Every structure is written in structure tokens, then in C-alpha cells.
From Swiss-Prot:
This is Photosystem I P700 chlorophyll a apoprotein A1. The PsaA/B heterodimer binds the P700 chlorophyll special pair and subsequent electron acceptors. PSI consists of a core antenna complex that captures photons, and an electron transfer chain that converts photonic excitation into a charge separation. The eukaryotic PSI reaction center is composed of at least 11 subunits. The gene is psaA. It comes from Nasturtium officinale (Watercress). GO terms for cellular component: chloroplast thylakoid membrane; photosystem I. Pfam families: PsaA_PsaB (PF00223).
Length: 750
């Protein structure tokens, strides 16, 4: 029998009034740094001010103070999110056609922005149907509002005001928990309590309350809406909540209340907690009863998970014990020491969270179209394309951020003296093998995937279609993907016998679902064209990983620069007199990784956009004949590079290029402007610092001549600053160009 020492009781976990509130520091730019606070000598000062303002590590080495600043900043972030949400709901209430859309979502487009006529820009107010003129929105808010049971613009107003109140509350909390009652370091490090509260509270009770809202408010209101009842005739949410008879008319088992729950006769509830699979044929979205059931189930899981970790009661798991027990046959000490890393070095913790959240965001992108969760979302092609693109970009940025903070952790926080033979140490010791193998994989994937396209272009150019890789000549069918599709399509009858349809129509087997003459979703065929582009995906993803992982594993030292850790996270080169050591800092790997991330995500969203227009989206005639937007040309056109240029980029750019004089003209201007921003980046990326310094000095000479020289000396951007400005404009220009291209196209044809 093991006698454990009693767990320590909870101590006082906050400091009262640690830092007095004062606005004086607001008037002192750079108050957090002795150097910057002195004020500007040269124009470099303003760059340093921005670079270090939120780099709390550089303000102090006191971990408790850093933790408090981060914690407080999180409340500020939440405040901004609530403010943004409030603005979205306010636009829905004040400037939108939400009530009209609700009454006829198949013929009326969603709009929540009306442009004021000042210099003729009211041309942007296009006709979205129902006699309303405004800018068509593609955020999916209307669909979410309908799914949650919002039936009037008054309800949107109330929610907007509520969000503003919450924004103010968050601002107050940020001030309060830094200036009035600041948590002690021990509170931030109490991971078991944190897990219990976040799992049971945020995820468990959050899901449970959403499930409750769905059952008591969303489901009945959506039942009425689907039956064509006028939104103004539908009872208000509180009437459903307070009056059980109203619900019992729609779902008879409601009359029995909680009795079936306590008598374990749960199947009584299967009217509104279903397990159907597939899509609701009326709205083209997942069955809302399936969604309510899902949230209830998730809530139970997380409520249980939120009681798993050991706090004051001496029962449950301890994270440190779990990690230290985690040893495999080939992993030495395993995760020993990881607990200390993750509870004291926040960059490591952040890196992990960014990697998980980034991956999750990309998973969301893929589920939003394959299992469209909201009513009338699947037939709103512009919104579908926007949601996919948005979540892919966000996921890409978060994953690069994960590598960035992993590298910062390696440079600033990793202590090699007390890490021996644990997992991280073992990875670092065979990093050469990892990176060289990964490099080989990248070369293999690059040559072979691109080589297949080049072969096809060559055969096509020589007029030999019979020798091309295509569905009609030499087939390269994606047999594994087709097998997975088939397995899922057959699941309802076999591995998931309770389901009536498979999780997603895209797997195959089922019929297509059309709403209002438009295809919502249908089985997606995969062929040679998909096989080719999937290998490009594999190539770009592996190269991104190669660059980012090399940056992390060689952040502290390399054969070229053994003392790299002393040079810091970002540095241009290893000092004067040592050639060939530029672009080796951990920061430079993030910089280079961003370009490949952009590359990878671009191919993904191009693939998605074209594939959906070619093989999924389109109209259906009364005879049941489907006409796709681009007539199924993906399979034959996307198998050559020339096809991508001619039939995707050029052919589909016609809408944005010809948008002048129409309500889509703003996209035409953005398309042009964003190209300019992108080109502007090349000026920073292709020229060196000396060129600009030389130019600046001659400009300063002219100012001196006229006696108008400023006191602050102008300086050229440092090498790192120039690269940062370059990559920012490159990504901003590239993403905005793609945005204008996609939206002008899909709003015009979708």
C-alpha cells in the first residue's frame, strides 16, 4: 500500500494591487525598454518599437510578470473579438436583408452592407434579389443566424448590444487581472485545474448549453421555417423555453419531460436527437437534430474529461506522471522533463497550441463543404468557397507560427545542460538524418509530381493525347482514395447500422441533394487529375515542413555556425568577414517557410475552386439533368500545366477583369491594387540594404542643402526588416489578388 502525503491545500493565488494604474506610460513610447524609451536617434527606432512592444520576454525576465502580461493581453484580444462580432450582428440588424433572405433563401442573396453614394460608388450595390440592392456577403453569418433560430432584425440588435457589453467586460477583466488582482505564477502553472475547468467548463458546459439552445429554440423555429411559416408568425424563443406544450406539438415526447431520461428510456428522445447522417433535403445542410445530438454527446465526453485530473482531492491523473511514464522502446527517457518545459517556457506551450489549432482549422475547412452544417449554406457557392479559402489560409499561418515559436523556444529557453536522452534531445541528436531524408523525399516528390505534368504538357503539345496520363489514356487512378470513399459510402449498412446515410455525400453511394434547382452536394468522383494534383499537395507540404523543421532543429547550432544560439532568434549573417552565412537564423527559416506555405495553400484552394465548379456545383433541370458551372472540364484540363493556366486562371479571371462598370467592379480594382501590393514586395525582396542607404544619403544631402534636414537620422531598413516588409506585402498582395479573383468569379456565375 502506498501512503501518499496529503495534497497541499489551495493557497492565495493572487497578488492585490501589484501595479498601479497610470496613463503616464502611454505618453512614453517604448517605456518597456531602456534603449527605446530614450527616444529616436535614427528612423530605426520606430521599427524597434513595433518589433519589441509585444515581445514580453524582452521587457523582463520575471516569468510571473510575463505570464500576467500575456493573460491580460488575452482579455484584450477577446474584447476585440466581441467588438468585431457586435459589428457583424449590427450590420445584420441595420443594413441587411436578413428577414427577406429568411423568407426565400434560394432566390435572394445575403447582403449586409449598403454603400453610400458619394462619388458614384453606389454602383457596387448589386441586385441580390427581392428588390434589395447591396453588397453580397460571403461570411455565412445569415446561415448561422438561421440555424440558431434568429428570426428578426430586433434579435440581431439585442445580440449586438450584448456583444458590446461583453467587449467592455473583457477590457475591464484585462485591467483588473493585471492591476487589481494579478494571478501568481503558481496559478498559471496549475495545469490540472486548468484542464478540468477548460474541459468541463468551456467545452463541456459550452457544448451542453448549445445543445440545450438547439433543442429548445433552434429546432422548433427551423421546423416552422422549413414548413414555410412566415418568420413573424413563429413564436419567440422564450415562448418555446417557457411553454412545454408548444414544443410537444412538434415533438410529442416533450410532453413526458425528463421522465424518459431518469427511467433510462432514452429512445423516446430520438425525435429530436437523431442519428441520420447525410443532408436535410429541404435546406441542404446537416440535419439540425443530428447536430443537437452531436453536441449533447460531445458535452458528456468533455464533462467526464473535465473530472479526470488530480487537484486537491488526491484522485485522478497528474500530467507530470503521465508524461514521465511515456517511454517507448526506442525513446530513451521519453517525455521526462517535458512537464517543466511546458509549464515554465510559454513559447513551447504556444508552439504546441498553434500546431494543434492550425491543423484543426484546416480540418474545419474540409468539413465545411463536405458536411455543410448550416441551412442553405451548401447552395451559397460564394460563401462555401470563401469559408474554405479562409480556413485554409488561417490554418497555414497558424502552423508556420507553431514553427516560429518552437524556434524561439529553442533559442531563448532550451537548456541543453539538463536535457539528456529525452525525446527532444534524441531528435536533436539525429537531426541530420531527419533533415536529409526529408530533403530526399522533397526532391523525389517534386521531380515526380511535376514530371507527370511536364510529360502531359509535352505529349499534348506534340498532339499525342493517347500517350498522356489521363482518365481516357494512361490511367493513374487514386485507388486508395477511392477505396476510402467506398468504405465510407457502405458504412451505414455495415459499420454504422443505425445511420440512414453516410457522414458525407461526397463519399459516394447516395443520391445528390439539390435545393431550389441548385446542387448542394453530390458524390465527388476522383480520377487521374486528382491523383496528379494531390502529389503536388504532398510536395508543397513536405517542402514547407522541411524548411520549418530545419529552422527549429538547427536553431541553436549547426555545422556551419556552431554558436548560433548566441546570435539570437533573428540575425542577418554571422558577422562581417564570414561569407556564406546569411539567411541561416531561425527567423529566416520562418520567413522562407511562409513563401512555401503560401505556395501550398494556393494550390489547395485552386484545386478546390476548380474541382467544385467542374464536378459538384451547378444547376439541375426538372428532368434531373445536372449542368455543372464549368461542365466537368477538370478531369481533362487540369492534367497539364497549360490547362491550369488557360482553363482555370485565364478563363475564370474573365469575370474579375471585365467587372468594370458593374456591381463587381470593386473586385476589379482590388485585383489590380493587390497585384500592385504584391509587386511592391519584390522591391524589398530583391534589393540590398546598401543600395537604399546610398540613395538615402544623397536625399539627406539635398535636405541639408535646403536646411530642412530632420533631427532624426533616416536609415535604410535593416536586412531583416526589409525581408519582413517584403514577405508581408507578398502575402497580403497574393491573398487579396486571389480573394478578388475568386469572389468576382463565383458571385457572377454561382
Amino acid at each position: 500500500m502506498i501512503i501518499r502525503s496529503p495534497e497541499p491545500e489551495v493557497k492565495i493565488l493572487v497578488d492585490r494591487d501589484p501595479i498601479k494604474t497610470s496613463f503616464e506610460e502611454w505618453a512614453k513610447p517604448g517605456h518597456f525598454s531602456r534603449t527605446i524609451a530614450k527616444g529616436p536617434d535614427t528612423t530605426t527606432w520606430i521599427w524597434n518599437l513595433h518589433a519589441d512592444a509585444h515581445d514580453f520576454d524582452s521587457h523582463t525576465s520575471d516569468l510571473e510578470e510575463i505570464s500576467r502580461k500575456v493573460f491580460s493581453a488575452h482579455f484584450g484580444q477577446l474584447s476585440i473579438i466581441f467588438l468585431w462580432l457586435s459589428g457583424m450582428y449590427f450590420h445584420g440588424a441595420r443594413f441587411s436583408n436578413y428577414e427577406a433572405w429568411l423568407s426565400d433563401p434560394t432566390h435572394i442573396g445575403p447582403s449586409a452592407q449598403v454603400v453610400w453614394p458619394i462619388v458614384g460608388q453606389e454602383i457596387l450595390n448589386g441586385d441580390v434579389g427581392g428588390g434589395f440592392r447591396g453588397i453580397q456577403i460571403t461570411s455565412g453569418f445569415f446561415q448561422i443566424w438561421r440555424a440558431s433560430g434568429i428570426t428578426s432584425e430586433l434579435q440581431l440588435y439585442c445580440t449586438a448590444i450584448g456583444a458590446l457589453v461583453f467587449a467592455a467586460l473583457m477590457l475591464f477583466a484585462g485591467w483588473f487581472h493585471y492591476h487589481k488582482a494579478a494571478p501568481k505564477l503558481a496559478w498559471f502553472q496549475d495545469v490540472e485545474s486548468m484542464l478540468n475547468h477548460h474541459l468541463a467548463g468551456l467545452l463541456g458546459l459550452g457544448s451542453l448549453s448549445w445543445a440545450g439552445h438547439q433543442v429548445h429554440v433552434s429546432l422548433p423555429i427551423n421546423q416552422f421555417l422549413n414548413a414555410g411559416v412566415d418568420p413573424k408568425e413563429i413564436p419567440l424563443p422564450h415562448e418555446f423555453i417557457l411553454n412545454r406544450d408548444l414544443l410537444a406539438q412538434l415533438y410529442p415526447s416533450f410532453a413526458e419531460g425528463a421522465t424518459p431520461f431518469f427511467t433510462l428510456n432514452w429512445s423516446k428522445y430520438s425525435e429530436f436527437l437523431t442519428f441520420r447522417g447525410g443532408l436535410d433535403p429541404v435546406t441542404g445542410g446537416l440535419w439540425l437534430t443530428d447536430i443537437a445530438h452531436h453536441h449533447l454527446a460531445i458535452a458528456i465526453l468533455f464533462l467526464i474529461a473535465g473530472h479526470m485530473y488530480r487537484t486537491n482531492w488526491g484522485i485522478g491523473h497528474g500530467i507530470k506522471d503521465i508524461l514521465e511514464a511515456h517511454k517507448g522502446p526506442f525513446t530513451g527517457q521519453g517525455h521526462k522533463g517535458l512537464y517543466e518545459i511546458l509549464t515554465t517556457l510559454w513559447h513551447a506551450q504556444l508552439s504546441l497550441n498553434l500546431a494543434m489549432l492550425g491543423s484543426l482549422t484546416i480540418v474545419v475547412a474540409h468539413h465545411m463543404y463536405s458536411m455543410p452544417p448550416y441551412p442553405y449554406l451548401a447552395t451559397d457557392y460564394a460563401t462555401q468557397l470563401s469559408l474554405f479559402t479562409h480556413h485554409m489560409w488561417i490554418g497555414g499561418f497558424l502552423i508556420v507560427g507553431a514553427a516560429a515559436h518552437a524556434a524561439i523556444f529553442m533559442v531563448r529557453d532550451y537548456d541543453p545542460t539538463n536535457r539528456y536522452n529525452d525525446l527532444l534531445d534524441r531528435v536533436l541528436r539525429h537531426r541530420d538524418a531527419i533533415i536529409s531524408h526529408l530533403n530526399w523525399v522533397c526532391i523525389f516528390l517534386g521531380f515526380h509530381s511535376f514530371g507527370l505534368y511536364i510529360h502531359n504538357d509535352t505529349m499534348s503539345a506534340l498532339g499525342r493525347p493517347q500517350d498522356m496520363f489521363s482518365d481516357t489514356a494512361i490511367q493513374l487512378q487514386p485507388v486508395f482514395a477511392q477505396w476510402i470513399q467506398n468504405t465510407h459510402a457502405l458504412a451505414p449498412g455495415v459499420t454504422a447500422p443505425g445511420e440512414t446515410a453516410s457522414t458525407s455525400l461526397t463519399w459516394g453511394g447516395g443520391e445528390l441533394v439539390a435545393v431550389g434547382g441548385k446542387v448542394a452536394l453530390l458524390p465527388i468522383p476522383l480520377g487521374t487529375a486528382d491523383f496528379l494534383v494531390h502529389h503536388i499537395h504532398a510536395f508543397t507540404i513536405h517542402v514547407t515542413v522541411l524548411i520549418l523543421l530545419k529552422g527549429v532543429l538547427f536553431a541553436r547550432s549547426s555545422r556551419l555556425i556552431p554558436d548560433k544560439a548566441n546570435l539570437g532568434f533573428r540575425f542577418p549573417c554571422d558577422g562581417p568577414g564570414r561569407g556564406g552565412t546569411c539567411q541561416v537564423s531561425a527567423w529566416d527559416h520562418v520567413f522562407l517557410g511562409l513563401f512555401w506555405m503560401y505556395n501550398a495553400i494556393s494550390v489547395v484552394i485552386f484545386h478546390f475552386s476548380w474541382k467544385m465548379q467542374s464536378d459538384v456545383w451547378g444547376s439541375i433541370s426538372d428532368q434531373g439533368v445536372v449542368t455543372h458551372i464549368t461542365g466537368g472540364n477538370f478531369a481533362q484540363s487540369s492534367i497539364t500545366i497549360n490547362g491550369w493556366l488557360r482553363d482555370f486562371l485565364w478563363a475564370q479571371a474573365s469575370q474579375v477583369i471585365q467587372s468594370y462598370g458593374s456591381s463587381l467592379s470593386a473586385y476589379g480594382l482590388f485585383f489590380l491594387g493587390a497585384h500592385f501590393v504584391w509587386a511592391f514586395s519584390l522591391m524589398f525582396l530583391f534589393s540590398g540594404r546598401g543600395y537604399w542607404q546610398e540613395l538615402i544619403e544623397s536625399i539627406v544631402w539635398a535636405h541639408n542643402k535646403l536646411k530642412v534636414a530632420p533631427a532624426t537620422q533616416p536609415r535604410a531598413l535593416s536586412i531583416v526588416q526589409g525581408r519582413a516588409v517584403g514577405v508581408t506585402h507578398y502575402l497580403l498582395g497574393g491573398i487579396a489578388t486571389t480573394w478578388a479573383f475568386f469572389l468576382a468569379r463565383i458571385i457572377a456565375v454561382g
